[in-house]
Amino acid sequence: MNQTLLSSFGTPFERVELALDALREGRGVMVLDDEDRENEGDMIFPAEIMTVEQMALTIRHGSGIVCLCITEDRRKQLDLPMMVENNTSAYGTGFTVTIEAAEGVTTGVSAADRVTTVRAAIKDGAKPSDLNRPGHVFPLRAQAGGVLTRGGHTEATIDLMTLAGFKPAGVLCELTNDDGTMARAPECIAFAGQHNMAVVTIEDLVAYRQAHERKAS
């Protein structure tokens, strides 16, 4: 990742701390991966406190595939099968079947309905019957071990939520340009600035976790 582009957001460790502060304040974070990987930026928000306005922003400026990052334990709790048995996607992204809240939604498409679905899936004591399948929210199962196991946006989202003190569940969506192309780092950074989001890279988070876990041991 081009460090010059990111320099205004501080050092790698400062960027992680600023991202955690942003999440705790209810703001979004732009998570960038490497140019050699997907080369994309994902908007992420805490699933517990994401607002309808933030969901609307995500739908308006994102790919349209609004994802809920969850752990394997939560996937089992909700009895969500993986979308396919044999995952042949380039990065092994862990999609489960799609979901809709069983109550409190109309068609499930609106920003408010998608927030309702997210809340239904992550509430304490959530049961499989709280969700209909299929739906308009795409759960993503994170790998155990987070970014130290798999350097994906899914794992980064779970790691950031956990470090910020939230339940391990977050909403993500890839940022797109107005012409429908994928936003790359310069566009992602500009968008984050316009919408008061912190910016962090997966590489930053890997280094941060490694350093802190070394200290702890």
Curated annotation (Swiss-Prot):
One of its GO terms (molecular function) is 3,4-dihydroxy-2-butanone-4-phosphate synthase activity. Pfam families: DHBP_synthase (PF00926). The record marks H136, E174 as: Essential for catalytic activity. Pathway: Cofactor biosynthesis; riboflavin biosynthesis; 2-hydroxy-3-oxobutyl phosphate from D-ribulose 5-phosphate: step 1/1. Its EC number is 4.1.99.12. Its cofactor is Mg(2+); Mn(2+). Binds 2 divalent metal cations per subunit. Magnesium or manganese. It comes from the Bacteria. SUPFAM superfamilies: YrdC/RibB. D-ribulose 5-phosphate binds at R37, E38, D42, R150, G151, G152, H153, T154, E174. Disulfide bonds: none annotated. Keywords: Lyase, Magnesium, Manganese, Metal-binding, Riboflavin biosynthesis. GO terms for cellular component: cytosol. InterPro entries: DHBP_synth_RibB-like_a/b_dom, DHBP_synthase_RibB. Mg(2+) 2 binds at E38, H153. One of its GO terms (biological process) is riboflavin biosynthetic process. It catalyses: D-ribulose 5-phosphate = (2S)-2-hydroxy-3-oxobutyl phosphate + formate + H(+). Mg(2+) 1 binds at E38. It is an enzyme of class 4 (lyase). Belongs to the DHBP synthase family. Homodimer. PANTHER family: 3,4-DIHYDROXY-2-BUTANONE 4-PHOSPHATE SYNTHASE, GTP CYCLOHYDROLASE II-RELATED. This is 3,4-dihydroxy-2-butanone 4-phosphate synthase. It comes from Salmonella paratyphi A (strain AKU_12601). The lineage of its organism: Bacteria, Pseudomonadati, Pseudomonadota, Gammaproteobacteria, Enterobacterales. The gene is ribB.
